[in-house]
Design a protein with these regions (language model features):
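Conserved Class I S-adenosyl-L-methionine-dependent methyltransferase catalytic core
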Residues: 5-99
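Conserved SAM-binding loop of SAM-dependent methyltransferases across substrates and taxa
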Residues: 114-127
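Conserved SAM-binding motif I beta-strand of class I
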Residues: 130-135
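Conserved SAM/SAH-binding beta-strand->alpha-helix loop
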Residues: 137-139
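Conserved SAM-binding loop
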Residues: 144-145
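Conserved SAM-binding strand-loop segment of SAM-dependent methyltransferases
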Residues: 152-164
Length: 167
């Protein structure tokens, strides 16, 4: 077994740190909506990313919301929100260039999560000819379809369940 695969002893500083992190996560999920969502669906799931994009702390009480605020302010989640802004800017720039050349705009995202970052990037006054969102998770597809309906974009945006590695 390599050193990377050997469990850390809880009696070492690193082992104690990670053991405490696991305990705090298990405890925090009882109060913090974001931590619970991460534990339930995975911290890299589309549901968790959508929650992080919204950046609104929620919890069972003020203590839970404080935990959630701390969780949402983590440097990694701040980076994810910046990535969303960068993707939105890239979509808007590409759309502008295509429009200037008189070409149609079609957007495809093959691993959309809930699709919020694409939907947020769409300019209502100049919607693309089509937007096609895909994700493998039925939970993400249902949430994405609800966002599309909420924004009245059914005529332009579609969301289908499909694996990014399938054709």
């Amino acid at each position: 077994i390599s050193a990377e695969a050997t469990p850390l002893s809880p009696f070492t500083p690193r082992g104690a740190y990670w053991a405490a992190q696991r305990r705090f996560t298990r405890l925090g999920r009882h109060w913090s909506t974001g931590v619970k969502l991460g534990v339930d669906t995975g911290f890299d799931s589309g549901s968790t990313l959508d929650y992080v994009y919204q950046n609104r702390p929620q919890g069972r009480n003020a203590f839970g919301r404080a935990i959630d605020r701390y969780y949402l302010d983590a440097v990694g989640w701040r980076g994810i929100r910046q990535r969303k802004a960068n993707i939105g800017q890239a979509i808007q720039t590409a759309t502008q260039h295509l429009r200037e050349k008189g070409k149609p705009v079609h957007v495809l995202d093959i691993a959309s999560g809930h699709g919020r970052y694409v939907l947020d990037a769409l300019a209502a006054e100049a919607l693309p000819e089509s937007v096609r969102l895909r994700d493998y998770s039925p939970i993400n597809v249902a949430a994405g379809q609800a966002l599309i309906a909420e924004r009245g974009l059914q005529s332009t945006v579609s969301f289908e369940e499909a694996n990014a590695y399938d054709r």
